Amino acid sequence: MTSTLNTLKSNSGSRKKKLRKGRGIAAGQGASCGFGMRGQKSRSGRPTRPGFEGGQMPLYRRVPKLKHFEIINQKNFSIINLEKLNDFKDNDTVNLDSLVKKGLIFKPKFPLKILGNGKLNVKLKVQAHAFTKVAKQKIEDAGGSCELINNK
């Protein structure tokens, strides 16, 4: 027997019949339809909104709203992209001091991190506290070197 569209049937157990509530007690979901006796949750419409505690002051309003939580052990960096390093000449050493002298970083408050945005056209010796993977790859591809400095 060949299967055609009019003879196709779904697998047994793959489809479940919808419960028809309120159609007599023999159906199993008649009378109160599985909602119990009386009360707000047996009425029509959504019973209560999420987080409702029956009129009691809810938890999200009892807990104080504290502001200005600082991240513990947050690492801040003075960042610079590779495209800015093209201002240097070949075989120059790039570090936080040389970037301040060139005017590329104004206030060296934090350790230096090199980001990989842009293209590097010069061969440089870069000394920084952190590099992104892309930045390190691009510096080495340009013939330069990356030196990690420990910030203590």
From Swiss-Prot:
Compositional bias ranges of the Gly residues kind: 25-37
Keywords: Ribonucleoprotein, Ribosomal protein, RNA-binding, rRNA-binding
MF terms in GO: rRNA binding; structural constituent of ribosome
Comp. bias intervals (Basic residues): 14-23
SUPFAM superfamilies, per the entry: Ribosomal proteins L15p and L18e
GO cellular component, one term: cytosolic large ribosomal subunit
Region (Disordered): 1-57
Quaternary organization: Part of the 50S ribosomal subunit.
Membership in a protein family: Belongs to the universal ribosomal protein uL15 family.
NCBIfam families membership: rplO_bact (TIGR01071)
Annotated function: Binds to the 23S rRNA.
Protein name in UniProt: Large ribosomal subunit protein uL15
Organism for this UniProt entry: Prochlorococcus marinus (strain MIT 9301)
Lineage: Bacteria, Bacillati, Cyanobacteriota, Cyanophyceae, Synechococcales
